[in-house]
Amino acid sequence: YMYHGGTNPYNPLHTMGETQASPGTNHNDLPHMTYDFQAPLGEVGQVFETPFHEGRFIHQMLTDWGSELLQMNVDSLSRHYARRGAFEFYNDYVRIKNESGTSHVTFKDYRTGGATIDWTTVEPFCKVDDLIYFIEIRGKKPQISVDGKVYTCKLNKQQKAGKLNVCVLSYEKAKTAYKIDGKLLYAKNGGILYKSDSCIVEEVWTKSPVIAATVTEVKKADAPRVVPMGRQAVAAQPVEEDFAKAAVYTINYDTSGINNYDNLFLRINYRGDVARVYADGRLVADNFWNGKEMWVRMADLVGKKVELKILPLRKDAPVYFQKEQKAMIE
């Protein structure tokens, strides 16, 4: 839905986020400001590595095989598998029962290069001339069956599989691989490769010096709110009056000597229900807790009084968390 998370414009009177109380997009509640769906690129432009690379893998596969896939019929559908011609799409994520599920695409009876790929335990990634690149499926032995013969592949090595030339990349190696102008190139520094005009650019996020922030507690939180159910029978977000019961902190920092704040962020690691950050009394960022750090643009904070409010979370709140987050609050 969104490749890059975003932030809604500030409006003291009305939120642009979805809310159960509205007559339109009212399936759930969203924060007042943040509009981040854990997309490949986060709200402030940070790269979420897993969705970024796994989305890129399937986009590259569709670039090279999409025209063939488009002409194939849907053969079967089940809870975990979808078969379309020679492509099998697999997803074993089942909410609650198997939250750390996996997904992948493999070949089944695929005719190419004068041979038939009977099945694979590796994912197709891209084609470069007559060489087919695959990506390992972690936890599985990398094998390709061609014309009835099974070939066990060495990772990151080009080899023959019957009449076919193949190469199975390790998952980590694949994260550095980009097909540009018909060639497979590798990012040497763990960055992102792309073509800009007449050159290939590797963009790398470098670690900048950490600026320590001082956090001072101004007010302790009152008792956690009882989380009611909204119109759609899901947990309702807090109303403005609830934040009078939040824990309040001031945040101070020293950014002297820094002239550009575009790539400088405040990262807040907290546990609770909802967090809000104010600059000179104006709301600039908010967050429904999900176990991850909250990122705030320093450009919105510099030179202003910064205040953090955190609402505590009841352990029995009717909010859905995956098992990893549940363990953090129990």
Model-identified regions with their sequence ranges:
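Carbohydrate-binding surfaces of carbohydrate-active enzymes
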Residues: 2-213, 223, 243
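Edge strands and adjacent loops of beta-rich recognition modules
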Residues: 223-249
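Exposed aromatic-hydrophobic patches
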Residues: 251-253, 293-301
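Aromatic-lined ligand-binding clefts that engage carbohydrates, nucleic acids, or primary amines
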Residues: 257-279, 287-288, 308-309
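A short acidic/small-residue loop/turn micro-motif
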Residues: 285-293
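Noncatalytic modules at the cell exterior or secretory-pathway interfaces
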Residues: 300-312
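Short acidic/polar inter-strand loop motif in beta-rich domains
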Residues: 312-320
